[in-house]
Amino acid sequence: MLKDQNLDIERKQDHIEINLTKNVESTLKSGFESIHFIHNALPEINYDSVNTTTTFLGKSLQAPILISSMTGGTTRARDINYRLAQVAQKAGIAMGLGSMRVLLTEPDTIKTFAVRHIAPDIPLLANIGAVQLNYGVTPKECQYLVDAIKADALILHLNVLQELTQPEGNRNWEKLLPKIREVVHYLSIPVIVKEVGYGLSKKVAESLIEAGVKVLDIAGSGGTSWSQVEAYRATNSLQNRIASSFINWGIPTLDSLKMVREVSKDIPIITSGGLKSGIDGAKAIRIGANIFGLAGQFLKAADTSESLLFEEIQLIIEQLKITMLCTGSRTLKDLAKAEIRL
C-alpha cells in the first residue's frame, strides 16, 4: 500500500513537471479554427453593458469560465491550487481540483486540495477517476471527497487512453457504467463526467445522460495529450513508443461538442480541450457550450505567480467581451445566436 501511495505522489509530481516543461500538445486541432464570426461593424452596444455573467451549479459566475482540473497531492500542487483558488474567487469563475484518489489513502494530502476557505463563493469541483470504481472506491468514499473540500459537484473523469499508456495504469474498464449510475444516485450533489482530452462521443453521452449524469465536460482533442505526457514518463523504449503512437488520437473538441449537443439540448456542457483564448471560448458558447474550460496556460501562470495568473484570466475575459461586442452580442444568450461562417 505504501508503495502505491508513493507512486501516486511521484506520478502527480511528474505530471506537473512534464506539463510545464515539455511539448505535450496533440497534433490534432480542436476544430474551432474553422469557425469565424461575422464581424459587426455597427454593433450599437456600449462596451460597459456587455454582460458575461451566467450561473453554474446554482452559483453566479462573472464569466463562463472553468479552471479545468489539474493537480493536487504534493507541496507544489498545494501552492498552485491555492493560487488558482485565490484568483478564481477574485475573478468569479469556477474551479476544478485534480484527481483526489490519493486523499483516500493519504489523509494528510487534504491540505493540497482544501481551498474552500480561499474561494468561498465559486463553484468548486471534486474529482476522481471513474475507473477507480472498478478498483474498490465506493460511493461513500466519493461523498467523503466531496465533503472534504465542500465541493458543489463531483467530477468522475474518463481517462482510458492515459491509463492504458501508463505502465502502472488501470486496465479493467468493464461494467463501469452501472457503478457511475450508483454514484450518481448516492451523492447529495451533481455528478459531472469529464473526458481528459480525447472527447465524448454521441453514444457515450447518451449512456451517461441515461445514467443520470447532470453535466458533461467533453474535453476533446486539440490540447494536452495525456498519452504524450505518459510517453515522457516511460521508463523504457517500448512504453515510450506505445504512448507516442497516440499523439493524434481522439475526437476534436468541436466535433465532440456538436455530437453531445445533438444528444441533448438541455444538459449543461463544459467545453474544454485545446481552447487557447476567450475567442475560442466564444466560439464554444456559440456552438452549444454553457461554459468553457482551460488548463495549460493557467497551470503555467499559477506556477509562477498569482498576479500572472490573474492577468491570464483577465486576458481571456477581455477577449470574450470584445468578441461579444464585435458580434453585436450584449449577453451570452445573444452570443449563442451570433452569425458565423464555417
Swiss-Prot record:
Transmembrane segments: none annotated. Keywords: Cytoplasm, Flavoprotein, FMN, Isomerase, Isoprene biosynthesis, Magnesium, Metal-binding, NADP. It comes from the Bacteria. InterPro entries: Aldolase_TIM, FMN-dep_DH, IPdP_isomerase. The keyword Isomerase applies. It is found in: Cytoplasm. Substrate binds at residues 11-12, 99-101, 162. Its cofactor is FMN; NADPH; Mg(2+). One of its GO terms (biological process) is isoprenoid biosynthetic process. It catalyses: isopentenyl diphosphate = dimethylallyl diphosphate. GO terms for molecular function: FMN binding; isopentenyl-diphosphate delta-isomerase activity; magnesium ion binding; NADPH binding; oxidoreductase activity. Mg(2+) binds at residue 163. It is an enzyme of class 5 (isomerase). Its EC number is 5.3.3.2. The keyword Isomerase applies. Involved in the biosynthesis of isoprenoids. Catalyzes the 1,3-allylic rearrangement of the homoallylic substrate isopentenyl (IPP) to its allylic isomer, dimethylallyl diphosphate (DMAPP). Homooctamer. Dimer of tetramers. Belongs to the IPP isomerase type 2 family. This is Isopentenyl-diphosphate delta-isomerase. It comes from Rickettsia peacockii (strain Rustic). The lineage of its organism: Bacteria, Pseudomonadati, Pseudomonadota, Alphaproteobacteria, Rickettsiales.
